[in-house]
Amino acid sequence: MTRVKRGNVARKRRKKVLKLAKGFRGSHAILFRTAKQQVLKALKYAYIGRKNRKRNYRSLWIVRINAAVRPYGITYNEFIKQLKNSSIALNRKMLSQLAILDHSVFKTILDSCTPGFK
């Protein structure tokens, strides 16, 4: 059997994991074995968090649009249906931004897609 020298490789691998674990509390930032476990867990949580962020923003946009159309006597659901029927291609993020920042443009969109709800 030949001798396998992998000191550099092992050190680089450990340093990489410990660098990712920087800022963790206690032994999770110092000991390689626990740091490795915590890094894997943190990466898993980060992945889940990226998915949840998209979900949260979409629900926030829906709430904002609903709050903007309610004073005109229409619900969010009816508004989206009327948008689809009048083939206005604006996504929820854009509609939410218009409702907050440029209310007059949002009102014209509302009037153009819902003529019966005035």
Curated annotation (Swiss-Prot):
Major localization listed first in the record, in broad terms: plastid
Xref: InterPro entries: Ribosomal_bL20, RIBOSOMAL_L20_CS, Ribosomal_protein_bL20_C
GO molecular function: rRNA binding; structural constituent of ribosome
PROSITE patterns named among the record's database cross-references: RIBOSOMAL_L20
Compartments where found: Plastid, Chloroplast
Gene Ontology cellular component list: chloroplast; ribonucleoprotein complex; ribosome
BP GO terms, sorted: ribosomal large subunit assembly; translation
CDD domains per record: Ribosomal_L20 (cd07026)
Pfam families: Ribosomal_L20
Protein keywords: Chloroplast, Plastid, Ribonucleoprotein, Ribosomal protein, RNA-binding, rRNA-binding
SUPFAM superfamilies for the chain: Ribosomal protein L20
UniProt record similarity statement: Belongs to the bacterial ribosomal protein bL20 family.
HAMAP family: Ribosomal_bL20
Summary of the function given for this chain in its UniProt record: Binds directly to 23S ribosomal RNA and is necessary for the in vitro assembly process of the 50S ribosomal subunit. It is not involved in the protein synthesizing functions of that subunit.
Protein's name according to its UniProt entry: Large ribosomal subunit protein bL20c
Organism: Gracilaria tenuistipitata var. liui
